[in-house]
């Protein structure tokens, strides 16, 4: 799976380098076996963002860092390019992806993260619960509101990455188990770039079969 993620990322012509960051020797061996670039990190990082921060500190000329998680075997280079292009706006400090193609099963599934945005497409909140809540809706929620599912790819300006990895954890992120809520809590704006490219990820073992079916249908 790591190889698929790596090779998918390498297809982006806008990335200057792709590095696997890990604290596991087995992953190091796997990446080296297919000729990938890998760097060992400390094993104490609470999140992938912190791990990215350790690696980015070794590269002084980096301006934007993209955190591509290892559970995204179908990552598409067009998604990565869209994230990078968001930084053409000098006000953007953090960017991530969202997709409107969502059904009720995903809205109710706590492993599918939902996000709501303001009129500037900046995130207001991320949640494992349905947001907005439709308990009092008298219509079909899917026709009443354009629900947005979060795709867990993050990009940060290098100087912003240095700042957010210094932030103390918050109760909000801990109860939802969503690290990006820490950044919102401390006042960092997160630009949500909409995409129509569907790339199922693997959050739980049951997702493996869904990803394999997707590969059979679309590749």
Regions found by a protein language model. Give the residues of each.
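N-terminal glycine-rich phosphate-binding loop and ensuing alpha1 helix
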Residues: 1-21
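Short, structured coil segments at secondary-structure junctions
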Residues: 14, 34-35, 119
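Short phosphate-binding loop-to-helix
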Residues: 19, 25-68, 72-85
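A conserved hydrophobic position in a structured secondary element of the catalytic/binding core
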Residues: 22-23, 75, 156, 203
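Conserved alpha/beta core of the MobA/IspD/sugar-nucleotide pyrophosphorylase nucleotidyltransferase superfamily
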Residues: 142-219
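Conserved core of the sugar-phosphate nucleotidyltransferase
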Residues: 75-167
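Short, high-confidence coil segments that cap the C-terminus of an alpha-helix
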Residues: 15, 61-62, 90-93, 188
């Amino acid at each position: 799976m790591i190889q698929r993620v790596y090779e998918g990322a390498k297809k982006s012509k806008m990335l200057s380098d792709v590095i696997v960051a890990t604290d596991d020797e087995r992953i190091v061996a796997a990446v080296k076996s297919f000729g990938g670039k890998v760097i060992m990190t400390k094993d104490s990082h609470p999140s992938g963002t912190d791990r990215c921060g350790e690696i980015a500190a070794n590269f002084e000329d980096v301006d934007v860092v993209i955190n591509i998680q290892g559970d995204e075997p179908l990552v598409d280079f067009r998604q990565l390019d869209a994230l990078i292009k968001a930084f053409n706006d000098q006000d953007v400090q953090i960017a991530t992806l969202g997709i409107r193609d969502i059904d009720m099963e995903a809205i109710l599934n706590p492993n599918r993260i939902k996000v709501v945005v303001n009129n500037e497409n900046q995130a207001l909140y991320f949640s494992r619960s349905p947001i907005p809540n439709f308990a009092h809706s008298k219509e079909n929620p899917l026709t009443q509101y354009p629900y947005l599912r979060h795709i867990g790819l993050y990009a940060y300006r290098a100087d912003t990455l240095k700042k957010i990895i210094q932030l103390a954890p918050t109760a909000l992120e801990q109860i939802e188990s969503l690290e990006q809520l820490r950044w919102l809590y401390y006042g960092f704006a997160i630009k949500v770039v909409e995409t129509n490219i569907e790339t199922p990820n693997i959050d739980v073992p049951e997702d493996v079969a869904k990803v394999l079916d997707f590969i059979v249908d679309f590749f």
